[in-house]
């Protein structure tokens, strides 16, 4: 697991925004939502922005998280999506 201090800084459950930056591919948003659904089922409407040159997409999704471990698991799983460069 990651060594974060989310449990010291936040009260759970809470809405937590994840920003996933990856290669511009039409399925990136669907893959992000699929990973989130696996760990936090719900109805999600992520926002997507393309980079200035169109090479990358930024997908922002707000997820209700229940613990530090929940956040860390989502960070890890989202980072493992093919084509993802960063998870913020």
UniProtKB/Swiss-Prot annotation:
It comes from the Bacteria. InterPro entries: UPF0250_YbeD-like, YbeD-like_sf. One of its GO terms (cellular component) is cytosol. Coiled coil: none annotated. Belongs to the UPF0250 family. HAMAP family: UPF0250. This is UPF0250 protein SO_1163. It comes from Shewanella oneidensis (strain ATCC 700550 / JCM 31522 / CIP 106686 / LMG 19005 / NCIMB 14063 / MR-1).
């Amino acid at each position: 697991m990651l060594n974060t201090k989310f449990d010291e800084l936040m009260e759970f459950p809470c809405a937590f925004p994840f920003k996933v930056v990856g290669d511009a591919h039409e399925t990136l948003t669907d893959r992000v939502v699929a990973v989130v659904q696996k760990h936090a089922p719900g109805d999600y409407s992520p926002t997507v922005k393309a980079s200035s040159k169109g090479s990358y997409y930024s997908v922002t999704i707000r997820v209700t998280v229940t613990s530090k471990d929940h956040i860390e698991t989502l960070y890890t799983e989202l980072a493992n999506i093919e084509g993802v460069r960063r998870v913020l």
